[in-house]
C-alpha cells in the first residue's frame, strides 16, 4: 500500500498544437485584412462626384443605358485583339441615337410631333414644353447688328467694299435692269437704330424623308419696329419710241420699313443631306463678280494658312453642316413708299407707284425666305486653330507671346475704336449735290434689289434735326409748285 502511495501519477504533456493553430490563424487574418484593404481602398474605383448642375433635376431625368452599350471588358479585349484600320477606326453612330425622339429624350425636351393633314401639308402642333423668352439671344443679335453697322461706317471710303458700291452694282445689273430705266443712283441709305426682338421660341418635330425620325425645327416670333431703316434712289424712265431716249421722266423713290413681324423657322441640315433645289441665280455684274471671286480666294487662302499653322492638311471638298431658315407665310411687312415723279410738273406720293413698289418688295421677299423656300447658310469651322487665336484686351496676367499677340490685335483694332463715338443710326449718302430730300418720318425699308454680297456699307452720319422740308426737290427742277 505504501508502494501505491509513493507511485506518482504521470502528468500528460501539454500539446503545442493549439499555439500553432492560433499563430497561423492570426497570420491568416492579418493577410486577409491587408488584402481586403489593398483591394477595396487602393485598387477600388472611386465613386463618381455628385453633379451640381443636375442636382435640381427630378429623378425622372436619370439617363438610361443605351441598348447599344456593350460590355466594357469585351470592348477592351476586342480593341486589343483587333488591329484597327483606316476604315474602321471611327465607330459608326447608331441611327437611333441621332433621331428626333432620342435627342428630345436626352435633352429633357417634350415636343409633340406634327401630323400630316389631308392635303399633304404638315399640321404644326406646339410643344408642351414651356416657350423660351430668348432674352440672351436678343442681346447677342443686337451686338452683332451693332457691329455690322459700325463696320459698315468704318468702310464707307472703301472703293470696293462699301455697301453703296455694292448696291449700285446690283441695281444696275444689265441682265436684270429693263432697258426703259436709266442708271439707278442710291441717294440715301439708313441701317436703322433699333434691333429685332425674338420671343416665344419652341421646338417642333417635322417629317423629313432625308433624315431618320424626322427633323427638329425651332419656331420663334420676331418683331422689328424701326423708323430709320430706309433706302432712297433716283433714276429716269426712258421713252425709246420712235427713237431711243426720245423722252425722259425723272423718278425719285424712298422705301422705308415701318414694321416687320413674323415667325422664324430655323433647322439644321446635316452634311449628308442633298442640297436643296433652288433656282440658279443669274450671274453677277463684273464688278461684284470680281469682288466675290477675290473674297472667296482670300477666305480660302486664310483657311489654308490656319490649317498649315496647326499642322493639318488642307481640306478639299469636305461636307459642311448648314442652317436653313425661313419665315412662315403669315408674316407682316408694312412699308412706307414716298415717290416724286416729273421735273417741272411733279407728282408726289402717287398711290399706284406705292402699290407697285410694295407688291414687288413682297414678291422679292417671298421668293427667297418664305415657306416653302428657305435660305441655307453653311456653319463656320469651330475647330480651334492657332491662326485665329487672340487675347482679350485688359487681362493683367499675360505671357510674352500673349503680349505680342495683344500688341498685334491692338494695332488692328485701333481704327475700330474711332467709330465708338458714332451713333447707332447710320446713314449712307451718295450724290449729295443732287438728291431728293424726304422728311424724317418713317425712314425704314428695303427695296426690290438683288443686294448680292453686301459685306461693308459706306455710311455717313446725319443728325436727325426734324427740320427737313416736306417739299420734294428733284434735280434740275424749277422752284414751282408741286402738282399732286
UniProtKB/Swiss-Prot annotation:
Gene Ontology molecular function: lipid binding
Stored CDD domains: SMP_Mmm1
Spans traversing the lipid bilayer: 23-43
Lumenal topological segments: 1-22
Keywords in alphabetical order: Endoplasmic reticulum, Lipid transport, Lipid-binding, Membrane, Transmembrane, Transmembrane helix, Transport
Entry protein name: Maintenance of mitochondrial morphology protein 1
Residue ranges, Cytoplasmic side: 44-484
Chain intervals with Polar residues compositional bias: 65-78, 85-98, 399-408, 437-449, 466-476
GO-annotated cellular components: endoplasmic reticulum membrane; ERMES complex
Homology family: Belongs to the MMM1 family.
Purpose of the protein: Component of the ERMES/MDM complex, which serves as a molecular tether to connect the endoplasmic reticulum (ER) and mitochondria. Components of this complex are involved in the control of mitochondrial shape and protein biogenesis, and function in nonvesicular lipid trafficking between the ER and mitochondria. The mdm12-mmm1 subcomplex functions in the major beta-barrel assembly pathway that is responsible for biogenesis of all outer membrane beta-barrel proteins, and acts in a late step after the SAM complex.
GO terms under biological process: mitochondrial genome maintenance; mitochondrion-endoplasmic reticulum membrane tethering; phospholipid transport; protein insertion into mitochondrial outer membrane
Membrane topology classification: Single-pass type I membrane protein
Biased composition (Basic and acidic residues): 413-427
Organism: Aspergillus niger (strain ATCC MYA-4892 / CBS 513.88 / FGSC A1513)
Biased composition (Basic residues): 54-64
Amino acid at each position: 500500500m505504501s508502494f501505491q502511495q509513493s507511485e506518482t501519477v504521470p502528468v500528460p504533456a501539454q500539446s503545442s498544437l493549439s499555439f500553432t493553430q492560433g499563430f497561423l490563424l492570426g497570420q491568416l487574418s492579418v493577410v486577409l485584412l491587408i488584402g481586403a484593404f489593398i483591394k477595396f481602398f487602393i485598387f477600388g474605383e472611386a465613386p463618381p462626384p455628385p453633379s451640381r448642375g443636375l442636382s435640381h433635376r427630378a429623378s425622372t431625368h436619370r439617363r438610361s443605358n443605351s441598348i447599344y452599350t456593350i460590355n466594357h471588358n469585351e470592348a477592351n479585349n476586342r480593341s486589343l485583339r483587333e488591329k484597327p484600320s483606316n476604315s474602321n477606326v471611327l465607330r459608326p453612330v447608331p441611327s437611333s441615337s441621332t433621331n428626333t425622339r432620342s435627342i428630345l429624350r436626352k435633352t429633357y425636351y417634350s415636343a409633340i410631333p406634327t401630323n400630316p393633314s389631308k392635303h399633304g401639308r404638315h399640321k404644326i402642333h406646339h410643344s408642351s414644353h414651356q416657350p423660351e423668352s430668348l432674352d440672351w439671344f436678343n442681346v447677342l443679335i443686337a451686338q452683332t447688328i451693332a457691329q455690322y453697322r459700325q463696320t459698315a461706317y468704318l468702310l464707307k471710303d472703301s472703293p470696293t467694299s462699301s455697301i453703296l458700291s455694292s448696291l449700285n452694282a446690283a441695281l444696275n445689273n444689265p441682265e436684270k435692269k429693263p432697258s426703259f430705266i436709266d442708271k439707278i443712283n442710291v441717294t440715301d441709305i439708313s441701317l436703322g437704330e433699333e434691333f429685332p426682338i425674338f420671343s416665344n421660341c419652341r421646338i417642333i418635330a417635322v417629317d423629313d424623308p432625308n433624315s431618320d425620325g424626322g427633323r427638329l425645327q425651332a419656331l420663334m416670333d420676331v418683331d422689328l419696329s424701326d423708323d430709320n431703316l430706309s433706302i432712297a434712289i433716283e433714276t429716269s424712265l426712258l421713252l425709246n419710241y420712235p427713237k431711243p431716249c426720245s423722252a425722259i421722266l425723272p423718278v425719285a423713290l424712298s422705301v422705308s420699313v415701318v414694321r416687320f413681324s413674323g415667325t422664324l423657322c430655323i433647322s439644321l441640315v446635316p452634311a449628308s443631306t442633298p442640297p436643296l433645289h433652288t433656282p440658279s441665280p443669274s450671274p453677277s455684274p463684273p464688278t461684284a463678280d470680281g469682288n466675290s471671286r477675290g473674297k472667296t480666294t482670300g477666305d480660302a487662302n486664310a483657311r489654308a494658312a490656319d490649317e498649315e499653322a496647326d499642322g493639318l492638311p488642307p481640306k478639299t471638298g469636305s461636307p459642311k453642316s448648314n442652317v436653313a431658315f425661313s419665315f412662315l407665310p403669315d408674316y407682316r411687312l408694312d412699308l412706307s413708299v414716298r415717290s416724286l415723279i416729273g421735273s417741272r410738273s411733279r407728282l408726289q406720293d402717287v398711290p399706284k407707284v406705292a402699290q407697285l413698289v410694295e407688291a414687288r418688295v413682297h414678291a422679292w421677299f417671298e421668293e427667297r425666305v418664305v415657306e416653302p423656300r428657305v435660305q441655307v447658310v453653311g456653319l463656320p469651322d469651330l475647330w480651334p486653330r492657332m491662326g485665329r487665336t487672340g487675347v482679350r484686351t485688359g487681362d493683367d496676367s499675360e505671357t510674352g507671346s500673349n503680349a505680342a499677340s495683344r500688341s498685334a490685335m491692338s494695332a488692328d483694332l485701333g481704327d475700330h475704336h474711332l467709330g465708338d463715338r458714332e451713333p447707332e443710326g447710320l446713314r449712307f449718302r451718295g450724290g449729295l449735290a443732287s438728291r431728293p430730300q424726304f422728311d424724317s418720318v418713317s425712314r425704314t425699308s428695303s427695296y426690290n434689289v438683288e443686294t448680292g454680297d453686301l459685306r461693308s456699307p459706306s455710311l455717313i452720319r446725319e443728325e436727325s434735326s426734324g427740320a427737313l422740308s416736306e417739299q420734294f426737290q428733284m434735280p434740275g427742277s424749277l422752284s414751282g409748285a408741286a402738282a399732286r
